Amino acid sequence: YLTNNLQQELLFQVLEGINSALTIQGAKLIGGHTLESRKIPEEPFALGIESSLTVNGIIDNKKYFWSKGGMKKGDQILISRPLGTGIIFAAFMNSKVKPYILDSVLKEMNKSQHDIVNYINQLTNINPHSKIVNACTDITGFGLLGHLSEMLESTNRDQLKMNLEPLKIILEMDNIPVYDGVKELLDQGFESTLAPSNEIFLQNID
């Protein structure tokens, strides 16, 4: 549906954008595949482009990496950005979100977490013998409760192998950062698609 020249230009711009983000993270794009959609694209054509990345790397054996497991008793949870995007987008589909709230969410979602990682690494470099992070994960498709449950499952497998008591997580709701407007939208009855599964995950969390 698009001319070869336009396809090449769009692909070039996409790759430039991806590389500009990867360079900041110290990563390189080393390959990939392209597929042409069967759907007739709508203008602007750039909005019809979908891209995804698979990340692979090699760890220096002198360094430790942040895995999902490894939580320790007494650990505190660091949440690097507010929660509630699922609720906000559910309300957005019903035209119930104020523009400034949506703008702030999109701006935050586009912000790299690189500065936070650098800050933690700096703390580690100051005291190399202190392990600042015991476990780490992203909060994406399974929400906060889903990912915490995964971390608990991974951690407690190791706990049982060492004949230690399984850990539980205590969440202080007032200390969990959420986007502006989320609590009001909850009161109006909006919920994310994860709400039913979150009720199941609550069994592992106090």
Segments from the language model and where they lie:
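Short beta-strand-loop/turn "lid" adjacent to the catalytic site in phosphate-handling enzymes
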Residues: 1-3
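Glycine-/charge-enriched secondary-structure boundary and capping motifs
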Residues: 5-28, 35-51, 62, 122, ...
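A cross-domain feature marking catalytic cores of carbohydrate-active enzymes
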Residues: 33-34, 55
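Active-site glycine-rich loop that binds ribose-phosphate moieties when present
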Residues: 52-66, 100-123
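Acidic/histidine-enriched ion/cofactor-binding microenvironments in catalytic or ligand-binding pockets
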Residues: 57-83
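Glycine- and other small-residue-rich loops at beta-strand/loop junctions that grip anionic moieties
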Residues: 69, 80-81, 105-109, 134-140, ...
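Short, Lys/Arg- and Gly-enriched loop/turn segments at beta-strand edges
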Residues: 84-91
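Gly-rich Lys/Arg/Thr-decorated short loops/hinges at beta-loop-alpha junctions or inter-strand turns
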Residues: 93-99
